[in-house]
Amino acid sequence: MAAVSLRLGDLVWGKLGRYPPWPGKIVNPPKDLKKPRGKKCFFVKFFGTEDHAWIKVEQLKPYHLHKEEMIKINKGKRFQQAVDAVEEFLRKTKGKDQASSHNSSEEKNRRNSSEERGKQSAREEKRKASLSEGKLKKGTGEGKKRVSSVSSERGSKSPLKRAQDQSPRKRGRPPKDEKDLTIPESSTVKRVMTGTVAGFKWPPSVSEPVKDSDPHFHHFLLSQTEKPAVCYQAITKKLKVCEEETGSTSIQAADSTAVNGSITPTDKKIGFLGLGLMGSGIVSNLLKMGHTVTVWNRTAEKCDLFIQEGARLGRTPAEVVSTCDITFACVSDPKAAKDLVLGPSGVLQGIRPGKCYVDMSTVDADTVTELAQVIVSRGGRFLEAPVSGNQQLSNDGMLVILAAGDRGLYEDCSSCFQAMGKTSFFLGEVGNAAKMMLIVNMVQGSFMATIAEGLTLAQVTGQSQQTLLDILNQGQLASIFLDQKCQNILQGNFKPDFYLKYIQKDLRLAIALGDSVNHPTPMAAAANEVYKRAKALDQSDNDMSAVYRAYIH
């Protein structure tokens, strides 16, 4: 097949990493967004997903030539919305082109009419002048003098009048009341902003808005630029125009998880063990995105809701692993993770060569390394993938996934990670994800303790806690986490979104991690003591924000 030339403005199908092809348009990147070195690539704005990314030429295909092929292999709702947006955009653009052609024709007719009226006026003036000259020749001397005077006076005005009436028309200009309001596009602009691919000419505008665009998929891959802050400002400014034309309000990290609605679910059978706060939301999203899921939970009643949604029931962890291709597990702590694998009818009994096990629990590096060794010793494949987030983010499919271990298995889990999270990171060998997750939760737990300490200090010094929150929300610390946890405290609502006992467990494990490399963690140690006091006050099963009560009792 002959190579197809692509240019700025072309509509294309773009393939980004392991994600399915998606309709987009080649556009100009912001000035501060550097182009990747190496192979030729184009900056593509994807319809409907809010994505912008550099895509290599070999990963781009002309939209019209491959439309039927792509529609057959992609069936997601979000994908169909994107295709509809492209088609609507093309229909409207075609209508605008026809209207422009019609207006140009009318304008040409008006100009021709004006020129014709000018010529008729000139002929009439010439005829009148000829008649006047004939009368002068036949008149008396006095008459000649009088007529000559009048004729002279008329002759002094007529050329001026004729010049006024005719000169603009001779140049083909319309009268002032018929002024052409169309601003012609320069050939240079037209050449830059439009292009031809396989015989199709693409208009310079961008697509129309996609209805129900998901507001969650809105963050940008700043690692492509050496000046993240400057780049973010530049691209935000540049995309204000695109916002009006496409409904795009922000940009998504292009090398991470694609839009949930566009997922092509894997044909592999998925198992899931553990339906707690996090696991329940994860399974729900896997089912919504079309995955075949078998579930198991220590308390079987929790499985009922998911059975109604289309999941299958596994009687034991071993049965789930033996009947599924990839089995995920999300349990509370290291002991629960080990019991699930090594206990009676556990995961290990169902492992055979080729079976895959993904542990999403937040545990220490030693525990996850031990689990990996026993799984691999039976011929299985292992991946650790703890998640950063809370119950709400789990329900929304907006978790951050930290993975390490078998890279091939990480790729095989692509559609699952897309369903449950907004982005995923592969961190290398087993143990790295566990360490990173503990560090993340150490920072989060320490921050929560500091928030509670600040609110209680405001109270005892006679300051308004609400005013403190308002001030924090207007400053550099402003975040959804800060606002939600402060609201929990102000309203006295400690319904668990992230159990206090689990954040204290993570702090303890993070401190042990620091001890193992002789690294001091005094802030985490202090926060850990406050959480231990809160647990002593019977706050273990409340949200982590209940640490506030450790300061007021």
UniProtKB/Swiss-Prot annotation:
Location in the cell: Nucleus; Chromosome
Family (UniProt): Belongs to the HIBADH-related family. NP60 subfamily.
SUPFAM superfamilies: 6-phosphogluconate dehydrogenase C-terminal domain-like (SSF48179), NAD(P)-binding Rossmann-fold domains (SSF51735), Tudor/PWWP/MBT (SSF63748)
Subunit and interaction comment: Homotetramere. Binds to mononucleosomes.
Segments of this protein annotated with the region Disordered: 92-188
Keyword Disulfide bond: no
Domain PWWP: 8-66
Cross-referenced Pfam families: NAD_binding_11, NAD_binding_2, PWWP
Function, as annotated: Cytokine-like nuclear factor with chromatin gene reader activity involved in chromatin modification and regulation of gene expression. Acts as a nucleosome-destabilizing factor that is recruited to genes during transcriptional activation. Recognizes and binds histone H3 without a preference for specific epigenetic markers and also binds DNA. Interacts with KDM1B and promotes its histone demethylase activity by facilitating the capture of H3 tails, they form a multifunctional enzyme complex that modifies transcribed chromatin and facilitates Pol II transcription through nucleosomes.
Entry note about domains: The A.T hook DNA-binding domain is required for the interaction with MAPK14. The PWWP domain is a H3 reader and strongly binds DNA.
Region annotated Interaction with histone H3, chain positions: 214-217
Any one biological process term the GO annotation gives: transcription elongation-coupled chromatin remodeling
GO molecular function per UniProt: DNA binding; NAD binding; NADP binding; nucleosome binding
Chain intervals with Basic and acidic residues compositional bias: 92-145, 162-182
Matches recorded under InterPro entries: 6-PGluconate_DH-like_C_sf, 6PGD_dom2, 6PGDH_NADP-bd, GLYR1_PWWP, HIBADH-like_NADP-bd, HIBADH-related_NP60_sf, NAD(P)-bd_dom_sf, PWWP_dom
SMART domains per record: PWWP (SM00293)
Region (Dehydrogenase domain): 261-553
SS bonds (residue pairs): none
Positions that bind NAD(+): 271-285, 362, 505
Record protein name field: Cytokine-like nuclear factor N-PAC
Keywords: Chromosome, DNA-binding, Nucleus
DNA-binding stretch(es), residue numbering of this chain: 168-180
A GO-annotated cellular component: chromatin
Keyword presence, Transmembrane helix: no
